[in-house]
Amino acid sequence: SPMIRDRIDQPWREVGWDEAIAFAATRLRDIQARHGVRSIGGITSSRCTNEETYLVQKLIRQVFGNNNTDTCARVCHSPTGYRLRTTFGTSAGTQDFDSVEHSDVVIVIGANPTDAHPVFGSRLKQRLRQGAKLIVIDPRRIDLVRSPHIEAAHHLALRPGTNVAVVSAMAHVIVTEGLHDEGFIRTRCDWDEFQHYAAFIADPRHSPEATEALTGVPAATLRAAARLFATGGNGAIYYGLGV
């Protein structure tokens, strides 16, 4: 049963649905009366269906009379969508789920596939049991780091908020040690832009040794992970909303 209370210092009490809905509607209208029509908004989570999200925005627009509505699908994905579009020309990922079956070395960063995406997590585990190597970049010791029959080759247990420093340090190793595929870059990328990036990332301040104190990732571990990803065959990166 729904529960309501008139003040925060009062105990909750169970009521029927009609009373609960009327209570919420009255309180929301009171807020608008005191603070203006735009004082109410709504945001839906990734757990909501398209239909539920549609109904929430319809409630906000038609009942409350404003456009203060948003969804986690935009809030959470807009940074990655923008960067993917400027880097690859499309705001969608470049790989589908089937790609994991052709991967030789995989980076999982800011994601916990076995908990959040169990179907994909199962396929990834299957590929790892077949011999693919795994690099986990996550402050937490997620299931993929070590579980029955699989173990990550490297777990970069970085401090929260240092994703950019860790990725930059990996790029530093790959570029300064000449592990990048120059032919591929010349054919498929903007070579002049890459030259600018290579000069930037080769700066010693991006080295694993320089960033170790910030990220908490030992320089030797980070260098080994970067070398594995650059030389391990078909590489794949799967990221989640943790980045």
How does the language model describe each region?
Residues 1-179, 192, 197, 218-222:
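N-terminal export/assembly segments and adjacent metallocofactor-ligating motifs
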Residues 170, 188-243:
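Active-site phosphate/pyrophosphate-binding segments
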Residues 180-189:
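Short, flexible loop/turn segments with low-complexity composition
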